[in-house]
Amino acid sequence: MAKVSMRDMLQAGVHFGHQTRFWNPKMKPFIFGARNNVHIINLEKTVPMFDDALNYLSSVASKKGKILFVGTKRAATEAVKEAAANCEQFYVNHRWLGGMLTNWKTVRQSIKRLKDLEAQSLDGTFEKLTKKEALMRTREMEKLEKSLGGIKDMGGLPDVLFVIDADHEHIAIKEANNLGIPVVSIVDTNSNPDGVDYIIPGNDDAIRAVQLYLNAAADSIKTARELDIVVQAEQDGFVEAN
């Protein structure tokens, strides 16, 4: 499993919170103090809490669970997509559509439409259409890909959400809470930690910090999945030997 040291976190700026006037008092237990009117996060709390979160993500991955990475603000967009691809999981990195989890039935229909359009674009159907109609379908496909591309192969609700900014993604967290889906989230000093099962107190704005969280999560998930494949193969081999 990926190990992230306090030094790694300091170098990535994980300890820098938001301006003190924007703080959420519920984050007080995780704040070390303030410097130049900016809250400083207590990394002695963050390191073990991040380890717990990574252990949990690993255990979900080892049971073939589906992990949904959520990060729709600009600092996270590309990194979220890369991390999810790296560990063969799922992601939402543009606008969170209300009902993405709680109205899965409708989302599933949109995913089906996206896959139909993708098939049409490959099998020559678009070429038989008028230019205008082909353009309309291409635009529809691109729009659906942007919002649903990261979950089109999820095949049902996720087993856990890994969220980059609890404040920015509060709708996603609320939907997960309503469905009893566990939430692992980076929670900055301006955010409400309620509804987050595995709180990771940390900077949710600095790109280096965001990449640190995502890389560690992706590595942990990947390792757990690979370990599960090895164990499975050994068990299968053991069964065959009898």
Swiss-Prot record:
Entry's Gene Ontology BP terms:
translation
Note the HAMAP family from the entry. Ribosomal_uS2_B
Q: Which UniProt keywords apply?
A: Ribonucleoprotein, Ribosomal protein
Q: List the disulfide bonds.
A: none
Signal peptide start and end residues: none
> Record's Pfam families?
Ribosomal_S2
Q: Which GO terms describe its molecular function?
A: structural constituent of ribosome
Question: What organism is the protein native to?
Answer: Tolumonas auensis (strain DSM 9187 / NBRC 110442 / TA 4)
Q: Name one GO cellular component term.
A: cytosolic small ribosomal subunit
Q: What is this protein called?
A: Small ribosomal subunit protein uS2
Q: Which InterPro entries match?
A: Ribosomal_uS2 (IPR001865), Ribosomal_uS2_bac/mit/plastid (IPR005706), Ribosomal_uS2_CS (IPR018130), Ribosomal_uS2_flav_dom_sf (IPR023591)
The entry assigns this protein to a family as follows: Belongs to the universal ribosomal protein uS2 family.
